[in-house]
Regions:
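Soluble catalytic domains of membrane acyltransferases
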Residues: 74-165
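Membrane-interfacial terminal anchoring regions of lipid-handling membrane enzymes
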Residues: 1-90, 98, 161-164
Length: 165
């Protein structure tokens, strides 16, 4: 958890009681207006092919690899045998109550033998500040959005690319 643990727990309880399982629960999580999402996603699309993005992505993935190794020191994973028949690309989902959840998912998938792992995250996570924001933008992530144009055009291309590579 990034924020105050007790506040996060209370926010999770509230979200669950309201059946809002995709609600932001970390204190200070970005909440974006439609025009902010538009600008953020347009920048994401345009910047992804830039040299600077590729360098930052490489650095973020190296950090994430080291981080998932550290997660392994304090995390026990069970049920990996259920993945033994998966022989090709796959889509793994989880309900991200915390932007740190992808570290756990990456660790489990690496332990299961998968090497290329892309994480789907909320578009608003691209607006996070600091180290966690950097990782959300560059560690092989694919934003999902409530914006119809993005989900109809860009997101399917990202999924196809992740499954083909």
């Amino acid at each position: 958890m990034i924020g105050d643990r007790e506040q996060v727990y209370e926010n999770i309880k509230t979200a669950v009681s309201l059946n809002q399982l995709n609600s932001k629960v970390e204190p200070g999580d970005p909440k974006l207006l439609r025009e902010d999402k538009e600008a953020l996603l347009r920048h994401y699309i345009d910047y992804r092919t830039a040299y600077g993005y590729c360098v930052k992505k490489y650095i973020a993935e190296a950090i994430f690899y080291a981080g998932t190794s550290a997660v392994g020191l304090i995390t026990q994973v069970s049920g990996l045998e259920n993945l033994s028949e998966v022989k090709g690309p796959a889509i793994v989902t989880c309900n991200h109550f915390s932007p740190l959840d992808p570290a756990i998912v990456r660790f489990a998938m690496r332990k299961a033998g998968f090497t290329r792992i892309s994480i789907v995250n909320q578009d608003s996570n691209l607006a996070m500040k600091g180290f966690v924001g950097y990782m959300q933008r560059y560690a092989d992530t694919m934003p999902v959005s409530s914006l119809k144009w993005f989900m109809e055009t860009e997101f399917p291309n990202q999924i196809k690319n992740a499954l083909d590579n």
